[in-house]
Structures are given as C-alpha cells and as structure tokens.
Design a protein with these regions (language model features):
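Short, surface-exposed patches at the edges or C-terminal ends of soluble domains, predominantly
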Residues: 1-398
Length: 398
C-alpha cells in the first residue's frame, strides 16, 4: 500500500483539494485537528464559509473559441462535520449545484442534539431534535436521517468517579450504550477488515428509492441494539443496573451509507427561468455520475484533548480506556474513495483487523468460562497423575 501511495503522489499533477465547511456551528479546526493534519499529507485542505457565494465551490472556465465555458469544481470533495445551525436556501442551492456538477460530499450530521457536556454537572439530560433544514435535501438524494438515538450493548466504556482511594479519585468503567461500536455493514473496500468505529449519540438512517442512485450500507450497530425516540432522556442512572437484553432486539441498524450515481436536484422545477438559464450559474437538474457518504453522527471526526496538557490526541484514540478505534481509518478511506476511487483502499484494506469480543456473550457466559479455565487444568493434572500411578503399579506387579 505504501509503495502504491508513493507512486500515486509522485505521478499526479496536483494534490486534490478538500473543503471543510464553517458558518453553521460545525466542528472547528481544533476539534478536527488530527483529521485535517492527516488529510494534509495527501490533500490540500481549506476551511470555507459558503455564505451564499455562488463561486465558493465552483467556477466558470475560460470561454473557448466559440464563447462557451464550463462549470469547474474548486474542490474534489466537501466535508460537512456536525453543523448545529440551519442551512439557508442559498447555501443549500450552492451545495446542490456543486453535487450536480460532479462534486463529492461527506455528510456527518446529528439529527438529534445530545452531548456529554450536560452530564458533567447533572445525572441526566435530554436528547432533542435539531432542525438543520437539510432533511428535504438529503431525502431528495435518497436518505432519511431518523430522529432517534441508538443504544447498543456493544459499546465503548465510560469512566465514572465512584469514590476515592488514598486521596485519589477512583474511576470505574461502564459500557455507555449511547456510544456504540459500529461494525462493517458490507464487504465494500471502504470498510473491509476495519476496526470498530466509535460513535457518539448516533442515529439510524433509512433509504429512499431513487432511480439511478445505488446505495451501499457502510456502518451498522451490533445484534444487541435498542432504538430510543425523541425527546430521549439520557441518564447516568442506567449504569446502576444491568440492561435487559430483551429490549436490545433491533439488530444491525445502519448509521452510514454510500450513495453513488446520478442524483436529482432539490431545486428542479423550483427555480425561475432567469436562474435556470443563467450561464454564470450553469444550473443542472440532474447530476453527473458522482457520490456522497452520509453518516448520522457528527462527532465521528472529532479528536479528544489531553486532560492535563490540552493538546489534541489522535483521532479514534480514547484516552480514558487507552483504546484506538477505527474512526481515522474509516474517514480516510471515505475521503480516498470519494476523491480517488477504491484502488488504494483495496490494497490498504488487506491489513489485519483486531476482532472485538461480543461483550454481551462474554458477560453472560463469564462464570462458565471461568470454571472451565480453572477446573479443566486441575482435572487434567489429576487424570494424568492417576494414569501415571496406574501404569507404574501395573509395571511393577509384573
């Protein structure tokens, strides 16, 4: 993979350009530090505000000898990471036409507003719907982000202070079911042989039939999933008792999709003739063949910060449990696939994968395996001793 990556870098004429949007409360440069620094090894990265500017994502080429010009892309892909404020119709139109002219988009969207910040000072908080004015646009392209939260017994651990030992706080770790560990939902090269991806307050995504648009599931929850509607009470008191596996029965909820093909414009049959016929805008009602990835978790690209010194940590690394999840690998694969196709991804995905144990089965059969691992060696030693004594006695009786 490294050899192919070097050859690819040397042979291409210029680095592909990635735009990361600002202006709608998205994750900032510090929160995306490790993600962007890693991207900079292969791409040019710009933080941009759309702000109603028609030429921020596309531009017109120089006229040819017949006076005709084309719409060109300023960026090979656009990343939208956890917006918190609504998109106005101008910005939606600019994104729509960027897509229509062949642009690629990585959406990381939270349909439900929920945060651990509120649980720092209280035992509970409420997850509520957030209106970003993007539902109609994403629905037009073929997906529907559901207003729910996914709880999964196969989840990341959360450190909770439970007391003090020798004047130092005692931290115990509990599985926080609102932080599912997502697994590959298909054999697509983007997620093949991938480590679990840590999600935070993630939602499910449904698809809508759109002619000419092919959909591939990328990430899903485990077989022990529960769906909570909104408003959702999120309380730390749930950690005081064991979960009832019977209510975690909504297996394999999809949280990320790849959409490829020719998309219909949200603004088809909605724009006045002076706009649709404008050469400056170059309005298109159907896209060129292109692709997008939609993830129902806005925090997937956010890195943690060191507790004492405050510097950004590698994306996917959890400093509390000292585990590294597959967030960085997945998002780099996503960008690479959108920009360059699956050539390099197919090579990189041949790396070995760390297989996570099924936490629910481990807990339910803990005593069985403890007894097995404790008693079996003792039983084998006793049997070996008895067999040795019998053989020795038999030999000497002759």
């Amino acid at each position: 993979y490294k050899l192919a990556d070097i050859i690819n870098k040397v042979t291409r004429l210029q680095r592909p350009a990635i735009a990361i949007t600002e202006g709608h409360g998205e994750l900032d440069e510090d929160q995306l530090y490790d993600f962007t620094q890693t991207l900079l090894q292969n791409y040019r990265v710009d933080f941009i505000e759309i702000n109603g500017k028609i030429n921020v994502l596309t531009r017109r080429s120089e006229p040819d000898k017949n006076g005709r010009s084309d719409i060109l892309l300023n960026y090979d892909a656009v990343v939208i990471a956890k917006p918190q404020q609504p998109f106005d119709e101008k910005d939606k139109f600019i994104l729509d036409q960027y897509l229509m002219h062949g642009g690629k988009i990585l959406w990381m969207i939270d349909p439900v507003q929920a945060s651990m910040d509120s649980l720092q000072t209280a035992e509970s908080t409420v997850g509520v719907d957030i209106d970003l004015n993007l539902d109609d646009q994403l629905f037009k392209y073929g997906v529907k982000l559901n207003r729910n939260l996914l709880l999964d017994l196969n989840a990341a651990a959360l450190g909770i202070r439970t007391g003090e030992t020798g004047g130092r706080p005692q931290i115990d770790f509990f599985r926080w079911y609102y932080f599912p560990l997502l697994e590959a939902a298909s054999r697509h090269p983007m997620v093949k042989n991938m480590n679990a991806v840590k999600a935070e307050f993630v939602s499910s995504i449904d698809t809508v039939i759109r002619e000419g648009v092919h959909k591939t599931p990328l990430l899903k929850t485990s077989g022990y999933t529960r769906i909570a509607g909104t408003p959702a009470l999120i309380s730390l008191t749930m950690l005081q008792s064991d979960p009832d596996p019977r209510v975690y029965n909504r297996s394999g909820q999809i949280a990320a999709w790849l959409l490829e093909g020719q998309f219909p414009s949200l603004f088809a049959n909605r724009m006045p003739p002076e706009i649709t016929s404008s050469g400056e805008i170059g309005f298109k009602e159907e896209s060129k063949p292109t692709a997008m990835i939609v993830i129902a978790d806005g925090d997937m690209a956010r890195n943690q910060f060191h507790l004492q010194q405050g510097y950004p940590l590698p994306l996917g690394y959890d400093q509390y449990t000292r585990q590294t999840f597959g967030n960085k690998a997945f998002l780099l694969n996503a960008i690479s696939y959108l920009v360059e196709g699956d050539g390099l991804i197919s090579i990189r995905s041949r790396e070995l994968k760390l297989r996570l144990l099924d936490a629910n089965k481990v807990n339910s059969r803990r005593l069985q395996w403890q007894l097995f691992n404790t008693l079996l060696p003792v039983a084998l030693i006793i049997l070996s001793g008895l067999l040795f004594a019998w053989l020795r006695k038999k030999r000497f009786t002759r």
